Amino acid sequence: MGREIISIHIGQAGVQVGNSCWELYCLEHGIERDGSIPADRKQSSDVNNLNKDLGTFFSESTNGKKVVPRAIFLDLEPTVIDEIRTGDYKNLFHPEQLITGKEDAANNYARGHYTVGKELIDVCVDRIRRLADQCDGLQGFLVFHSVGGGTGSGFGSLLLQKLALDYGGKKSKLDFCVYPSPQVSTSVVEPYNSVLSTHSLLEHTDVSFMLDNEAIYNICKNSLDIEKPTYTNLNRLIAQVISSLTSSLRFPGQLNLDINDIQTNLVPFPRLHFVLCSYAPVISREKAHHETITVDNITSAVFSEKNIMAKCQPNLGKYMACCLMYRGDIVPKEAQKAVQNIRSEKSRNVSFVDWSPTGFKCGINNQAPVSTKDSEMAEVKKSVCMLSNTTAISQVFSRINHKFDLMFVKRAFVHWYVGEGMEEGEFAEARDDLLALEKDYESVSASTEGEEQEEEY
């Protein structure tokens, strides 16, 4: 019985994160850049054990000589995907899985969703269907995109709608979305694209993992001592998180979690499915020689605000659920002890809503993390990735909503969207939906606080 996953990479952010992910998966599974597995490695029982679950992410070519990623890369203009077509991994992907249009979305959700996107959508849906037909038991989709750009937001939403129509609730849709940074903006209309895109994510995805470049930039700068981190540095760190999250689907382990476990444990209410990620240890090669990495200190590190990959303050919110995905040389007893320590340290401000008293789900995968040769990150024997659903995430939405309101009250830039066939009413509808989302988070927080105060008397 297969448990295959199809990865869909959309727009510049999605495609570049995808590059880093597939580079890392190949390294972890001992796959060459052209998708072949060297003969000497094929004979080794270690490698066979490692590659037992390879079929989750890779399909085998007809002649059995190489493996091909179950992935599709989509962009409305060719430059970013052309880099894959000419890059180190050009022979890894099937040429039909790299799909490009001729003109870009110009940072405009409506171009990605209505005009330019419409021309490409049928080809994309057809390729995805073909990939799905090759699977014995498709588990679901991982979708990667940004919500600030035109392609990531507009075309991403269009594709998610099509997946919802074609596969309904039968297949999980996990979404990795890069949200705009509080300080750094790549385009003036980011707040519009983000609100319109989030409106679609609320309806058409099961879990959305939120990332933001500024938070990840700061982690690279402070923990890896990179003075001016590049997108490659950022994407390699994101790839480690995604690799941790998917390692239990790709390798054997003592306490493996599959996609459904992650979903069931992280999403208490269908709308509140936006999740924060943090990862530890993020440590440079120079420092690694002088540090002792214990399960206790990496567990403690993922609860620290400075290791969270989106800008928000978890100590101001309540946790509804929390998944700890350990990797490497770790036994369940150590993980349990580390979690107990977190619970008992009141000073940490790790507080849960009252209806989720246990709150923690742990997964342990025996496969240690690896780093690419030219990565600044040290290779370590153990790591942990935390996925948390906390009411603090509403801070991200209120920030974007505020920026949206400043422009929309003047109807600034709205004509660019209406000119591409969108109706102005869609802005108001999306904004109302996000206001309702903020209120949903508030009510979860408030009900807990109210009951806590009653207990004090």
UniProtKB/Swiss-Prot annotation:
Cited CDD domains: alpha_tubulin
Q: Note the InterPro entries from the entry.
A: Alpha_tubulin, Tub_FtsZ_C, Tubulin, Tubulin/FtsZ-like_C, Tubulin/FtsZ_2-layer-sand-dom, Tubulin/FtsZ_GTPase_sf, Tubulin_C, Tubulin_CS
Q: Which cysteines bridge via disulfide bonds?
A: none
Recorded GO terms, molecular function?
Answer: GTP binding; hydrolase activity; metal ion binding; structural constituent of cytoskeleton
The alphabetical list of record keywords is: Cytoplasm, Cytoskeleton, GTP-binding, Hydrolase, Magnesium, Metal-binding, Microtubule, Nucleotide-binding
| Any one GO BP annotation for this protein | chromosome segregation
Assembly, in brief, is: Dimer of alpha and beta chains. A typical microtubule is a hollow water-filled tube with an outer diameter of 25 nm and an inner diameter of 15 nM. Alpha-beta heterodimers associate head-to-tail to form protofilaments running lengthwise along the microtubule wall with the beta-tubulin subunit facing the microtubule plus end conferring a structural polarity. Microtubules usually have 13 protofilaments but different protofilament numbers can be found in some organisms and specialized cells.
GO terms under cellular component: centrosome; cytoplasm; cytoskeleton; microtubule; phagocytic vesicle
Give the reactions, separated by semicolons, that this protein catalyses. Answer: GTP + H2O = GDP + phosphate + H(+)
Q: Which Gene3D superfamilies match?
A: Helix hairpin bin, Tubulin/FtsZ, C-terminal domain, Tubulin/FtsZ, GTPase domain
Signal peptide as annotated in the record: none
Primary location class: cytoplasm
Cell compartments where the protein resides: Cytoplasm, Cytoskeleton
Q: Which domain of life is it from?
A: Eukaryota
Residues marked Involved in polymerization (site) = 457
| Species of origin | Dictyostelium discoideum
Query: What cofactors does this protein use?
Result: Mg(2+)
* Pfam families, A to Z: Tubulin, Tubulin_C
What does the record give as EC number?
Answer: 3.6.5.-
Binding, GTP = 12, 77, 146, 150-151, 186, 213, 235
Q: How is it modified after translation?
A: Undergoes a tyrosination/detyrosination cycle, the cyclic removal and re-addition of a C-terminal tyrosine residue by the enzymes tubulin tyrosine carboxypeptidase (TTCP) and tubulin tyrosine ligase (TTL), respectively.
Protein's UniProt name: Tubulin alpha chain
Binding sites annotated in the UniProt record for Mg(2+): 77
